[in-house]
């Protein structure tokens, strides 16, 4: 008897999932690899959303979130710019913001943390939460 084994489509741990990589290659979003990059990006004028992907090999929601964020940005008529958080600063950033689950979207304005959205949600929930976060003074 042969056991059927479904191939794992997620990249091995430590590799960037193609849908996450697309955010930097196709959309041109910066990848923040250190505290300097993070500070420089989040202190720019305006609103910013950081995508914290987590490990796509262990978290099957990561590719979905990588598809949702560009759509969310478009729904808000580019009211915020976006960046992808690199592995080197992910843990510290999650602990600092207290948004611990991944994937997550972390919103900043002029260097101030406004709030975060953890895990995959219904579209209406994304719209409501993002509206609430962007309305915050910071």
Swiss-Prot record:
Q: What superkingdom does the record give?
A: Bacteria
- Transmembrane ranges, per UniProt, are none
Alphabetized Gene3D superfamilies for the sequence = Glutaredoxin
InterPro entries for this protein: NiFe-hyd_mat_HyaE (IPR010893), Thioredoxin-like_sf (IPR036249)
Tell me the protein family, please: Belongs to the HupG/HyaE family.
What's the protein here called?
Hydrogenase expression/formation protein HupG
The species is Rhodobacter capsulatus (Rhodopseudomonas capsulata)
User: Which gene carries the instructions for this protein?
Assistant: hupG
């Amino acid at each position: 008897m042969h056991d059927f084994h479904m191939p794992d489509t997620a990249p091995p741990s430590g590799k960037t999932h193609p849908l996450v990589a697309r955010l930097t290659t196709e959309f041109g979003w910066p990848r923040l690899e250190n505290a300097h990059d993070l500070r420089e990006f989040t202190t720019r004028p305006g609103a910013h959303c950081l995508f914290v992907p987590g490990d796509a090999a262990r978290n099957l929601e990561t590719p979905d979130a990588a598809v949702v964020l560009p759509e969310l940005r478009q729904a808000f008529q580019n009211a915020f710019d976006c960046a992808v958080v690199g592995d080197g600063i992910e843990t510290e950033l999650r602990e600092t913001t207290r948004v611990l689950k991944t994937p997550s979207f972390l919103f900043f304005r002029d260097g101030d943390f406004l709030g975060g959205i953890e895990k995959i949600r219904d579209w209406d929930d994304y719209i409501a939460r993002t509206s609430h976060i962007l309305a915050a003074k910071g």
